Amino acid sequence: MSRIKAIIASVIICIIVCLSWAVNHYRDNAITYKEQRDKATSIIADMQKRQRDVAELDARYTKELADANATIETLRADVSAGRKRLQVSATCPKSTTGASGMGDGESPRLTADAELNYYRLRSGIDRITAQVNYLQEYIRSQCLK
């Protein structure tokens, strides 16, 4: 009888050791997976914050660019309607035929192509300035963290 008790006790001890090892193995896995989950959650939260920051930055500079374009279009419409004038440093050649007097020369004016180029340049300058400002802010707020 004592031999059967010894065998049963040995089997029970082996089962307890095996179960202890299995529980410890699954516990270690659970701890590892929890750490990975926490790290992934932290990374996702950081990415979402960065996405919100970039979206806010994009919205702000897109609005500035749209405002600049609206200002240029308003200026173009005002100049076309005669409400505003472009100043140009120019001279008008005097007419050599006939008597000279006040108002003989025409007022200096840009050609249609030059006026169009002026608006394109203004628009390009505003667009590039807005893009540079956006990229500088993006680098400061996102890349240098």
Curated annotation (Swiss-Prot):
InterPro entries xrefs: I-spanin
Location in or out of the cell: Host cell inner membrane
Periplasmic side: 25-145
Any Gene Ontology CC annotation: membrane
Endpoints of the signal sequence: none
GO-annotated biological processes: viral release from host cell by cytolysis
Cytoplasmic face residues: 1-3
Membrane topology: Single-pass type II membrane protein
Alphabetized UniProt keyword annotations: Cytolysis, Disulfide bond, Host cell inner membrane, Host cell lysis by virus, Host cell membrane, Host membrane, Membrane, Signal-anchor, Transmembrane, Transmembrane helix, Viral release from host cell
Transmembrane stretches, start-end: 4-24
Tree of life domain: Viruses
Described function: Component of the spanin complex that disrupts the host outer membrane and participates in cell lysis during virus exit. The spanin complex conducts the final step in host lysis by disrupting the outer membrane after holin and endolysin action have permeabilized the inner membrane and degraded the host peptidoglycans. Host outer membrane disruption is due to local fusion between the inner and outer membrane performed by the spanin complex.
Subunit structure: Homodimer; disulfide-linked. Interacts (via C-terminus) with the spanin outer lipoprotein subunit (via C-terminus). Part of the spanin complex which spans the entire periplasmic space. The spanin complex is composed of one homodimer of the i-spanin linked by intermolecular disulfide bonds involving two Cys residues and one homodimer of the o-spanin covalently linked by an intermolecular disulfide bond involving one Cys.
HAMAP family: I_SPANIN_LAMBDA
Entry similarity comment: Belongs to the Lambdavirus i-spanin family.
Protein name: Spanin, inner membrane subunit
